[in-house]
Amino acid sequence: MSSLVSISKKLSGQRQHRERSQPEARRKYGELEKKKDYKLRAEDYQKKRDTIKKLKKSAMDKNQDEYHHHMVNSETWADGRHFDKKTEAEETETQIQKKLGSLKDLEYVKFKLNEEKKKIDEMKGELHFADSSLNGKGNTHTVFVDTDSEAKSFDPRVYFDTTTSMLSRQFNRLKNEDFQNKTIIGAGTKEQVRKADRVRRTRYNELIKRVERAKELQVVVDKLELKKQLAAGSKSELKPQKVKKAKAMRAAVYKWTYERKK
């Protein structure tokens, strides 16, 4: 296209105006600024000039006693950086609770919670679950005797008819006759024992994670149920009173005033 333009100029006798190049003596200063470069530089300068002019005007017109809500909802660090304060909901919600915070997710969360509970019950039965740390409280075995002398002379090895090494077991506790009359079937080598222990630890770790996940899903269900109840009673004149604030692993507690049904 440019060749056609140049041909048309030649035919019409129009003079070609070429841009002047940098003289050889000033070659060290680089190429001369072209018109397109000047236009970009001028537009950038004018844009910055207008922006500074607007900012100066807004600063002159600003009221010193002006109030804005963001002044209360933000803070400034020692290095001068600004940041927004977290709201109460953001401080008391985990990542999962934020993702499943809609009432539409209530039935889905209930379904996943039931699945987790079923899986936990299956794993407890499979692993002969007896870890008190996951139950939240320690297990105790109380034995009642008739007299104080029996309590003082009480020997758990005699009572349970087992050895000292078996007393700490809360399940599958072998008796003395089992050691005498039966052959205890176990692993043949130390490597098999270590392998079985690794498998057992892996299963217990999975169980611990599932218990924690079930606890968090239960909290999500509680918070969604509370949100549903608050939304249902939003048109009522008797508003519920908050008794306890919500936490990351606990829903808020509200107290409703009894409303007589018509």
Curated annotation (Swiss-Prot):
UniProt keyword list: Nucleus, rRNA processing
Subunit and interaction comment: Component of the ribosomal small subunit (SSU) processome.
Functional note: Involved in nucleolar processing of pre-18S ribosomal RNA.
Record-level GO cellular component terms: nucleolus; small-subunit processome
Claim: rRNA processing is one of the keywords in the record: yes
Compositional bias per record (Basic and acidic residues), positions renumbered to this chain: 19-33, 56-69
UniProt family annotation: Belongs to the UTP11 family.
Name of the featured protein: Probable U3 small nucleolar RNA-associated protein 11
Localization per record: Nucleus, Nucleolus
Disordered: annotated segments: 1-33, 56-80
rRNA processing recorded as keyword: yes
Signal peptide (UniProt feature, chain positions): none
Lineage: superkingdom: Eukaryota
Polar residues: compositionally biased ranges: 1-14
Any Gene Ontology biological process: rRNA processing
